[in-house]
Amino acid sequence: MTKYGEMLIIDAKLVETFLKGRESFLIDLVERVYRAHHAGNTVCPDSYFLRFPDTPRDRIIALPSYINDQTCVSGIKWISSFPENVDHGLQRASAVIVLNNTDNGYAYAFIEASRISAARTAASAALAVRVLHGAPTSIGVVGSGPIAQKTLHFIKSLYTTAVPVKIHDLNGELVARIVTRHGPECSVVSLEEALGCDLVLLATSAGTPYVPMSVRFQPNQLVLNISLRDLHPETIRTANNVFDDVEHCLKANTTPHLLEQLNGNRNFITGTLAEFICSEKQLDPDHPTVFSPFGLGILDLAVAQSLYEHVQISGDGLRVPDFHGDMKR
């Protein structure tokens, strides 16, 4: 822990240095947090959305969280999504995390978090592949932004055998970049061909369904529904529908939320990823599987706390000794 009243500021460069090469560690960390959440050892309230009437696609989201398992950590992630940033050469998302002392509530760390957010999203998706599917024979990727690239990287870290990667994106420049980065097994394909792979990754900024309503996935397929709003409700109606957290995901007009509204019930829910990790549920092999992770703030906090502990040992970061001023009363 930082000295009493001190604030540790950790910038993007330190975050990147910490995350590099730690794919296996992060996947296992995410599994541990999912287990803690399933056991009731977390507090993960609803996300809070700040929206702008004149620019409805833009939003800033607050994700407060608390974990009480091997380590005790509380805090909040504040993450923005401004899709039009990409038209100006900027990343769509930016984020920070504040960690708070669970004894007195005082904040002790302020951390650049867009990279943490991408890494924990990718680690969660890779864990779902490991638990729900196993090694893919082909990977279809819809979207080629940072989340798609990071998730593909984490999935590939699980397995030594290279498989075809088929990528579809409306942005030709971005998709060319990801194809170049991931080597000769990557190719640019149509949406239909990408959706035909046995492992499908949806990572776009779509706000409403655009995949044709007629699309139906096959029993051998796992769909990582990262962006949550690409598919029509009918497409997932008969699938094995797996979530990180049911209550979190069934809101904000995600595809599962739309299906709940159409059905008037939640009978389409198969379970949470933690239930499969703990061998409490089984997939129906006669149906495809769709994993829809809303994204839990507890994952961000776990990664941020591990990073904080690493930086404390290394002595890096910017320390503000009297950040809170006179704390006595």
Explain the meaning of each model-derived region.
Residues 14-16, 234-329:
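Adenosine-phosphate binding glycine-rich loop
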Residues 199, 207-227:
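Rossmann-fold NAD(P) dinucleotide-binding segment
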